[in-house]
Amino acid sequence: MNSERKTATILEDPKINIKIKLSGLWVANMFLFIYVDYFGLYIPGVMEKIIEGEVAHTGIQISQVFLLAGITLMMIPSLMIFLSLTLPAKANRWTNIIVGILQIVVLVSALIGESWAYYIFATIVEVVLLLLIVWYAWKWPKQEA
């Protein structure tokens, strides 16, 4: 008879620092942001409009102002990846809450009139990620003074 005992292995579940959680959520958000725009290039007629100097289905002309606004919008999650890791706790918390809420407003407003399922689905996921950012920042761990 085999008398060997098997011991259960319990996996360690290390606590993840709030700054790393927030930065990771911003990374995921930024990738979705980029991929939504990238896949939008596959929509019939979009490339032709870009070649003509126009944003498809909007009537907006592609100009320096448009591109500056676009890169500024894209820069926000890029900078938040770094800022979430480096800002002091109080500034970090409020920056993530405020920027997260502002990004939600931008994304939801971009949904107006949208009919492509991929865009709607990705935006919902982005909003969920941003809500997690706001939630984690709001619930920032406290320590005794």
Where are these regions (language model features)?
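Juxtamembrane helix-break-helix junctions at the cytosolic face
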Residues: 74-94
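Hydrophobic alpha-helical segments of small multi-pass membrane proteins
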Residues: 96-107, 122-133
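Hydrophobic, membrane-inserted alpha-helices
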Residues: 76-81, 102-108
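Hydrophobic transmembrane helix segments
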Residues: 29-64
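Membrane-water interface at the C-terminal end of transmembrane alpha helices
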Residues: 128-145
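Hydrophobic alpha-helical transmembrane segments
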Residues: 11-21, 42-45, 64-76
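Membrane-helix boundary connector in multi-pass membrane proteins
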Residues: 92, 105-122
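Cytosolic juxtamembrane helix and N-cap/initiation of the first transmembrane helix
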Residues: 2-33
